[in-house]
């Protein structure tokens, strides 16, 4: 894997961040970018970068509600309303398999999310390839070399 491929998931996940936060993410050192698991944006606090075993505060400005909405707009390609169906589970999946977890208030009608209310935080979970973890499970989903009906 070359240098560019190593940081591709990190860059993809950071691509939905507002400019000041993306610059802060890009300013992280190489070991931090390699170990990063998520970006956390909490209303009123600087963005943090979560590594495998620690959380680092970035040099970003404090997060505003407008910043949180910008992330959703970037993730939904300019229309937060287009993600309503996808957000029912509490997260939105973006290009590259990265997930944005949401925390805040929504407007409900008959048990269905109708609109976003106030957002208080979000986490952008960086998807990473983990090789070899499915080896043992493979024998359980194959029947005479054919893949059984499987939900992963």
Task: Show the residue positions of the predicted features.
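P-loop NTP-binding catalytic core
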Residues: 80-146
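N-terminal accessory targeting/assembly segments
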Residues: 1-97
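Glycine-rich phosphate-binding P-loop
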Residues: 146-152
């Amino acid at each position: 894997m070359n240098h560019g491929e190593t940081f591709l998931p990190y860059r993809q996940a950071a691509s939905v961040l507002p400019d000041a936060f993306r610059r802060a993410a890009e300013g992280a050192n190489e070991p931090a970018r390699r170990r990063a698991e998520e970006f956390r944006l909490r209303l009123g606090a600087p963005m943090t970068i979560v590594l495998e075993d620690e959380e680092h505060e970035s040099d970003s400005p404090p997060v505003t509600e407008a910043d949180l909405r910008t992330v959703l707009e970037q993730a939904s390609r300019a229309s937060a309303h287009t993600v309503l169906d996808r957000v029912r589970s509490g997260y939105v999946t973006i290009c590259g398999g990265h997930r944005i977890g949401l925390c805040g208030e929504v407007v409900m009608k008959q048990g269905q999310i109708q609109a976003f209310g106030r957002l208080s935080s979000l986490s952008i979970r960086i998807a990473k390839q983990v090789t070899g973890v499915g080896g043992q499970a493979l024998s359980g989903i194959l029947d005479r070399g054919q893949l059984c009906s499987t939900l992963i």
